């Protein structure tokens, strides 16, 4: 005899019984008394299908291609058989000078690394307000600008919504859109890498996308968006996310303050390039008050680590160092550009950033060039996308890095 007990709670306690004829007996607790059937029951293990872990994964993620990151020093060192200090790393736009000395001192003097960080990053946001001239209530910090890109999408996009992407550009926008179940409408850039504003306007009118991601200076070509172009796009009924990861090298003023007058503008910044803190992952953004309220609700509470906040605040205390490093990189960018123009199989593009995009010409294979340089200990970036087929990107390093690159390139002509 099997018994199914209905507990007097919101949950149901169920005991399994064979198919049966049932009667209900009333007592202090409701009981269903079941007479077991004499019909044989098929083994449960035979009825169940084998369940694998991927059955629990959201369907759209099953087809997601992983993001292709740059290999770290440790992996490169093993693969190339070289010490990290013997590798000329010009493939990830990192700041070769590193952070101000105050950063290392501050990290070594951290008193409470065992305590959770301030969920509002108050000290950092106050320092950023002083640095940018924008009040701290408009600023939100993150574990790198990448986290903020994902946070924006999680707050703005429903599955099936659309974003506008303007390739070639930073591929994280397309990747995060796919992770969040959104569709990407691509509006390719013009041959000179400028934005096709007319086509963007047409797409916004007919497809009704939620947001557009723009990078200025753009990665990977180093072009900038002028104020007139940006204002035209801001006039459209779409949320504009302006990524200014490289703005310090452009000579242009940041648009962070614009969020006070444009309700559809978000501006993202980072400490990775300017302050040499790529390994500590700390970025920030400027948001209209009507938007930032909801990002505060949705963000992870302890997203900026104690170490990241300490390092970023220490870096901001030495603006002279940051300025000197910026000037050094801009000067080296111009020198590198002129030297690359002398290479018969490279056609470099003018850049407002800390990298230079080059078209590989004269029958030279771009991927093989990248691989051959790697065997010599020099790393540059090669792309597989159709927009950048036949291109390589070279980060600006120190003068000695430029010399090492040029010495290796001369092996090919």
Swiss-Prot record:
> Which coenzyme or cofactor does it need?
pyridoxal 5'-phosphate
Give the modified residues of type N6-(pyridoxal phosphate)lysine. Answer: 273
What does the UniProt entry say about where the protein is found? Plastid, Chloroplast
Quote one Gene Ontology molecular function term. Answer: histidinol-phosphate transaminase activity
Supply the alphabetized keyword list: Amino-acid biosynthesis, Aminotransferase, Chloroplast, Histidine biosynthesis, Plastid, Pyridoxal phosphate, Transferase, Transit peptide
List the catalysed reactions.
Answer: L-histidinol phosphate + 2-oxoglutarate = 3-(imidazol-4-yl)-2-oxopropyl phosphate + L-glutamate
Mutagenesis or variant effect for residue 381 to H: In His1-; no histidine biosynthesis
Q: According to its UniProt record, in which pathway does this protein act?
A: Amino-acid biosynthesis; L-histidine biosynthesis; L-histidine from 5-phospho-alpha-D-ribose 1-diphosphate: step 7/9
Q: Where does the transit peptide start and end?
A: 1-35
Q: In which tissues is it expressed?
A: Expressed in flowers, leaves, stems and roots.
The record, for InterPro entries, names: Aminotransferase_I/II_large, HisP_aminotrans, PyrdxlP-dep_Trfase, PyrdxlP-dep_Trfase_major, PyrdxlP-dep_Trfase_small
One Pfam annotation reads Aminotran_1_2
**SUPFAM superfamilies the UniProt entry points to:** PLP-dependent transferases
Gene Ontology biological process terms, A to Z: L-histidine biosynthetic process
**EC number(s) given by UniProt:** 2.6.1.9
Which EC class does it fall in? Answer: transferase
A GO term from the CC aspect: chloroplast
Q: Per its UniProt record, what HAMAP family does this chain match?
A: HisC_aminotrans_2 (MF_01023)
PANTHER family documented for this protein: HISTIDINOL-PHOSPHATE AMINOTRANSFERASE (PTHR42885:SF2), HISTIDINOL-PHOSPHATE AMINOTRANSFERASE-RELATED (PTHR42885)
Record-linked NCBIfam families: hisC (TIGR01141)
Question: Subunit comment for this entry?
Answer: Homodimer.
Family in the record? Belongs to the class-II pyridoxal-phosphate-dependent aminotransferase family. Histidinol-phosphate aminotransferase subfamily.
In its UniProt entry, what is this protein called? Answer: Histidinol-phosphate aminotransferase, chloroplastic
Source organism of the structure: Nicotiana plumbaginifolia (Leadwort-leaved tobacco)
The organism's taxonomic lineage, starting at the top: Eukaryota, Viridiplantae, Streptophyta, Embryophyta, Tracheophyta
